[in-house]
Amino acid sequence: MTFNDNARLDPSQVEDARGRRGGGLAIGGGVTLVILVVSLLLGVDPTAILNAVPTDTTTTDPSAQTVADCKTGADANKREDCRIVGYVDAIQQYWTDALAKHGTQYTLAPTVLYTDVTQAGCGTASAQMGPFYCPVDGKVYLDLAFFAELQTRFGAKGGPFAEAYVVAHEYGHHVQDVLGILSNDQRTGPQSTSVKQELQADCFAGVWTKHAADTGYLQAPTQTDIASALDAAAAVGDDRIQRETSGRVAPEQWTHGSAAQRQQWFSTGYSTGDYTRCTP
């Protein structure tokens, strides 16, 4: 998917935490156990000691590129981080307009770009978790290394629009939050609320894809772009991940839906262009 070169990007919608490097003391399980034993022997509240120990100090690399440099669509066509800025801008522009037509005010949600680990409102965010939306602070968290992992670990073909699909999916969860339908139900299975919620986010991503060019940031997606998104959706299907990691499929453990389901609901969103039709 190509950005219009003269599109003006708003990098303020992306928080860049990639230049930060931890320099503090990491408390391992053994150290924690020692602290607990000593505090109990001394009759001291162990939480007072644990809270007093510095667990994270950070430094910033001033020479690192930041998203503040992302000004135009031309920048987005050249740099991956600027591409994410452009996707975030286009996604939020669409949802601002789409929800307003139905009488709902959309609240902007920043994306936090980080490397390896960072602190989120929902706890510690690590690259192993993959991209996610945190309803506690209303932010999307993304380590750009995930896109390489999408290909090497999950077998996706990758590409710029696979990235767009991932970002749009996470913003789908923010839209659910805005609409008051984001659930914390942890039950699993093909018909679980958890799976339906993920499939709805896929559908919302498809809806945005249908209207992406209307925002002024992007050119209309090509069939290659759509195929890339569908390929990425299938790559993170529960059945495919289970088959590749354990050699068997256990539907009762699904949390995100099968490859076929994820492709189906992205396609539903794209074909209808109507988010009110996203009802798995």
Predicted regions span which residues?
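Post-HExxH zinc-binding segment in Zn-dependent metallohydrolases
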Residues: 2-17, 191-217
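Catalytic zinc-binding patch centered on the HExxH motif and its immediate surroundings
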Residues: 50-52, 117-143
